[in-house]
């Protein structure tokens, strides 16, 4: 029965074959392979003998005259077909069997070529329908065979089959995503005042090919990684019928559909595209964000390096959610934040043999920077001093380091710190985190620093619109936030381009994180969080531009020698520029001046004057408070001395000369110290007035029209 499947094919005959490039020529049959129902053929090409193995289906499709001549037993239910069409009908029946399973590659046992494996009832039905159409008698057997078999199908390798399976899954996934988008599009609210814009966004999204980031995507190595995370619309935005104007079509692209209005009041969309290392849509969980951002940095601290991870964005865009964990109402699940996930991996790494032998100890600190001041969140918000020692190492005096043994210890510290972090109300948000929260995981070996991982939840970046506020405290908050974000950007710039000088003294944030920007084994990741609502479009664009600016600075490391010069003015205007900006007289002022020069598009001379006035005022405030505290302590000693003098006067024969001399000495000392303190207070009040006048000189930028 097996040899019958080969029909009239014999060893030594010539058959037509089709090459992979489409050519058809003759070749001689050299062997018949019964195990896999194929034949081996050989031919001579350019003087060389070549050969290949071809399955019977392909041979019969090109050589229909070699098909087996078996008689088909007719069905008892219908009369037998005419003899003239019997051969054609056998070919038709064979084709129907193959076509019915073409979507699923057949096994060797189920491949059907001869008629003995087909159902007998199929034959008369096919032949009778063919007779009714009058097509069988009008064509030759060869033409019918070519027509019914169609183009020859080649056997597929396992690799091709796997690729087809992956492609099928991909197409299925895209179809599901398309159906989901269409379902969302159908749920539009025609009563929405922005219905026209909503339709424009829907039509634009319909033309995109979506390929979002998945956990199967590879993790790239970056010294500076910049990514963006979009959050979903919250309940308040949904109730206000706000629109989602952010689209993330692929793993590294973010698109903003900014509504605009022409002079004739016609509304239109301005679609702006940004590209980053990674882009996370609103369905990405914290674990996925951590996998691509902070997780690659954990190993850095075990290799004696410094790692830094920032969460940056508008208030309410998801920074604290990303760093601290999921919120359920007002309660936060700290175990799902990047703080805890990083700590978990640190303790897992400690168990590896190559790190276990180092006998490393893990410590944690948690502090906040508010209006240029540093407070310890693990020690009842004690105010700390940031000083630079003789070795140019920045020391946070009084900062407590708590040793942690497991992830649960870390979660407890995070709960303690989050409970007392500073927040307030601004013109941009009713509940704004107005401080930079810095959580550090420190590795020490025999008491010496081995590595440090700094995780920073930055304050809301509402572009410092509050620098022109009537409230001084709000002004100072906004000024410090803006200055620290500018300084952070320039420090990352210096890190990415290996610059000899890093302007870390320009703000308290970068001063505290100095060791994270100095050294070859330093790595940084920035997570820019954005709100999807149309009402937040301006702040979202500002966040993306800031992140894009940071990424631009590190896109082409080979162009480090072609860095834009700091000075953008001809040499003969340097003196005028020095006059305009003023001459720095301290390291802090020099770095601030350098910072403003490198960001002239964002920082005007008036704004630089304001920042300078704020810095001077903050320094004087610290000095006045410190002197006042010293005077208070001295006053306690004065009271004791005066009490002793008064007790001496109660004696009958006390020494009047001694009493007068001692009292005069106490009064002179009081006058000298209090006069000095009074002069400093006067200077401090003058600095307050100067800051207020400088704030009035700032030209507020006009908001971008929607």
Curated annotation (Swiss-Prot):
**What organism does this protein naturally occur in?**
Homo sapiens (Human)
Residue spans of biased composition, Polar residues class: 123-139
Matching entries from InterPro entries are given as: KIF2A-like_N, Kinesin-like_fam, Kinesin_motor_CS, Kinesin_motor_dom, Kinesin_motor_dom_sf, P-loop_NTPase
Q: Which UniProt keywords apply?
A: Acetylation, ATP-binding, Cell cycle, Cell division, Coiled coil, Cytoplasm, Cytoskeleton, Developmental protein, Differentiation, Disease variant, Lissencephaly, Microtubule, Mitosis, Motor protein, Neurogenesis, Nucleotide-binding, Phosphoprotein
Q: Which family does it belong to?
A: Belongs to the TRAFAC class myosin-kinesin ATPase superfamily. Kinesin family. MCAK/KIF2 subfamily.
Using the UniProt annotation, give all residue ranges assigned to the region (Globular).
Answer: 1-217
- Write out the residues that bind ATP: 313-320
Report quaternary structure and partners: Interacts with AURKA and PLK1. Interacts with PSRC1. Interacts with MCRS1; the interaction enhances recruitment of KIF2A to the minus ends of spindle microtubules which promotes chromosome alignment.
Phosphothreonine modification, residue list: 78, 97
Kinesin motor domain ranges (all copies): 223-553
What's its job? Answer: Plus end-directed microtubule-dependent motor required for normal brain development. May regulate microtubule dynamics during axonal growth. Required for normal progression through mitosis. Required for normal congress of chromosomes at the metaphase plate. Required for normal spindle dynamics during mitosis. Promotes spindle turnover. Implicated in formation of bipolar mitotic spindles. Has microtubule depolymerization activity.
Question: Which Gene3D superfamilies does this UniProt record tie to the protein?
Answer: Kinesin motor domain
Gene this chain is encoded by:
KIF2A
Q: Which PROSITE patterns match?
A: KINESIN_MOTOR_1, KINESIN_MOTOR_2
Q: Which GO terms describe its molecular function?
A: ATP binding; ATP hydrolysis activity; cytoskeletal motor activity; microtubule binding; microtubule motor activity
Per its record, how is this protein called by name? Kinesin-like protein KIF2A
Q: What additional remark is attached to this entry?
A: HeLa cells lacking KIF2A show asymmetric or monopolar mitotic spindles. Osteosarcoma cells (U2OS) lacking KIF2A or KIF2B show disorganised or monopolar mitotic spindles.
């Amino acid at each position: 029965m097996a040899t019958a499947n080969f029909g009239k094919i014999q060893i030594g005959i010539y058959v037509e074959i089709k090459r992979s490039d489409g050519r058809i020529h003759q070749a001689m049959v050299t062997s018949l392979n019964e195990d896999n129902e194929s034949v081996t053929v050989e031919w001579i090409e350019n003087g060389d003998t070549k050969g290949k193995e071809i399955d019977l289906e392909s041979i019969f499709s090109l050589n229909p005259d070699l098909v087996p001549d078996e008689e088909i037993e007719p069905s008892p239910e219908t009369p037998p077909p005419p003899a003239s069409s019997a051969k054609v009908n056998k070919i038709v029946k064979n084709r129907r069997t193959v076509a019915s399973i073409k979507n699923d590659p057949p096994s060797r046992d189920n491949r059907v070529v001869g008629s003995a494996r087909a159902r007998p009832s199929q034959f008369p039905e096919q032949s009778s329908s063919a007779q009714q159409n009058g097509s069988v008698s009008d064509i030759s057997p060869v033409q019918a065979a070519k027509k019914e078999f169609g183009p020859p199908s080649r056997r597929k390798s396992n690799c091709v089959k796997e690729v087809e399976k992956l492609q099928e899954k991909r197409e299925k996934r895209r179809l599901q995503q398309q159906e989901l988008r269409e379902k969302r599009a159908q749920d539009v609210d025609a009563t929405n005042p922005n219905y026209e814009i909503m339709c424009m966004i829907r039509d634009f999204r319909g033309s995109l090919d979506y390929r979002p980031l998945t956990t199967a995507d590879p993790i790239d190595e970056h010294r500076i990684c910049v990514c963006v995370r979009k959050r979903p619309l919250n309940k308040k935005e949904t109730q206000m019928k706000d629109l989602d104007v952010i689209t993330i079509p692929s793993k590294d692209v973010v698109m903003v559909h900014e509504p605009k209005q022409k002079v004739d009041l016609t509304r239109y969309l301005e679609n702006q595209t940004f590209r980053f290392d990674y882009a996370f849509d609103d369905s990405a969980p914290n674990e996925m964000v951590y996998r691509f951002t902070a997780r690659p940095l954990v190993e850095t601290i075990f290799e004696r390096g410094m790692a830094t991870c920032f969460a940056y964005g508008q208030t309410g865009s998801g920074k604290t959610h990303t760093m601290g964990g999921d919120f359920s109402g007002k309660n936060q699940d700290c175990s799902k934040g990047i703080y805890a996930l990083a700590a978990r991996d640190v303790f897992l790494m400690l168990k590896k043999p190559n790190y276990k032998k180092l006998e490393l100890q893990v410590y944690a600190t948690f502090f906040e920077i508010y209006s240029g001041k540093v407070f310890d969140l693990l020690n009842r918000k004690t105010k700390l001093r940031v000083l630079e020692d003789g070795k140019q190492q920045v020391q946070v005096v009084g900062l407590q380091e708590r040793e942690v043994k497991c992830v649960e210890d870390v979660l407890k510290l995070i709960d303690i710190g989050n409970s007392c972090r500073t927040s307030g109300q601004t013109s941009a948000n009713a509940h704004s985190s107005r401080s930079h929260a810095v959580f550090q995981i420190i590795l020490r070996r025999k008491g010496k620093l081995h590595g440090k991982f700094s995780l920073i939840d930055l304050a809301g970046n509402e572009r410092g619109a509050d620098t022109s506020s009537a409230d001084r405290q709000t002004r100072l908050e906004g000024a410090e936030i803006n200055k620290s974000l500018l300084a952070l950007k320039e420090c990352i710039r210096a890190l990415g381009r290996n610059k000899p000088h890093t302007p870390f003294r320009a703000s308290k944030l970068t001063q505290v994180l100095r060791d994270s920007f100095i050294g070859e084994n330093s790595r940084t990741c920035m997570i820019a969080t954005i709100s999807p609502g149309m009402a937040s479009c301006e702040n979202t664009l500002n966040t993306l531009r800031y992140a894009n600016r940071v990424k631009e600075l590190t896109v082409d490391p080979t162009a480090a020698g072609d860095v834009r010069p700091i000075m953008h003015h001809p040499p003969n205007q340097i003196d005028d520029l020095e006059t305009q900006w003023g001459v720095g007289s301290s390291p802090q002022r020099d770095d601030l001046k350098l910072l403003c020069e490198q960001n002239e598009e964002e920082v005007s001379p008036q704004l630089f004057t304001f920042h300078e006035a704020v810095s001077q005022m903050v320094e004087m405030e610290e000095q006045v408070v410190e002197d006042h505290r010293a005077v208070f302590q001295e006053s306690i000693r004065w009271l004791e001395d005066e009490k002793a003098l008064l007790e001496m006067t109660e004696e009958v024969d006390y020494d009047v000369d001694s009493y007068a001399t001692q009292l005069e000495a106490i009064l002179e000392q009081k006058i000298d110290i209090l006069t000095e303190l009074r002069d400093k207070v006067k200077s401090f009040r003058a600095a307050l007035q100067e800051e207020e006048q400088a704030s009035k000189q700032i030209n507020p930028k006009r908001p971008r029209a929607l």
